[in-house]
């Protein structure tokens, strides 16, 4: 097993600005899971394919509440009973510029549109293959989740406040935990 190394925040921000993916792990007392995280505005088809092939979890796109409201993205359910209150909205796809909706290129295109503050609701159809998540106001200060971390990191990188996350799942189906990520 290789030794796990935690990177300083300035390196993480530089990687996100360069369009790279980083790993964010939450507290062992919460979900104790690790996610691949990228900046939505810079996400590439290659990064989406990497997330699908090696992350293996759901690929989701955290956004700020103002963005969800501007795009008329209603909650997936009117009463969220999930333990961590993950705020899924209705799923979306780009209305134009895609062919299969699910390919890495099509998902990256939809996610980039979602992150672009100049794109309005008419650019999307519902339901779709992209799962936006509405981050909590004040980010990780109020809810220490991957959703808020992705939005906060994008902001710190000077990018639109939108991320892309994918839980890391091992080939056997167990979740990636901090202690076993080096395996």
At which residue positions do the language-model features occur?
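Catalytic domains of riboflavin
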Residues: 1-183
């Amino acid at each position: 097993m290789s030794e796990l190394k935690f990177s300083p925040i300035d390196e993480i921000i530089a990687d996100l600005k360069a369009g790279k993916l980083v790993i964010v792990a939450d507290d062992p007392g919460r979900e104790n899971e690790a996610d691949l995280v990228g900046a939505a505005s810079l996400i590439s088809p290659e990064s989406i394919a990497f997330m699908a092939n090696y992350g293996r979890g759901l690929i989701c796109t955290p956004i700020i509440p103002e963005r969800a409201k501007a795009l008329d993205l209603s909650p997936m359910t009117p009463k969220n009973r999930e333990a961590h209150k993950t705020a899924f909205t209705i799923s979306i796809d780009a209305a134009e510029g895609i062919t299969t909706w699910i390919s890495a290129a099509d998902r990256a295109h939809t996610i980039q549109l979602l992150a672009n503050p100049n794109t309005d609701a008419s650019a999307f159809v519902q339901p779709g293959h992209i799962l936006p998540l509405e981050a909590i106001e004040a980010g990780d200060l109020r809810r220490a989740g991957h959703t808020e971390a992705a939005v906060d990191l994008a902001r710190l990188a000077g990018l639109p406040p939108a991320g892309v996350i994918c839980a890391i799942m091992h080939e056997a189906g167990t979740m990636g935990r901090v202690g076993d990520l080096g395996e």
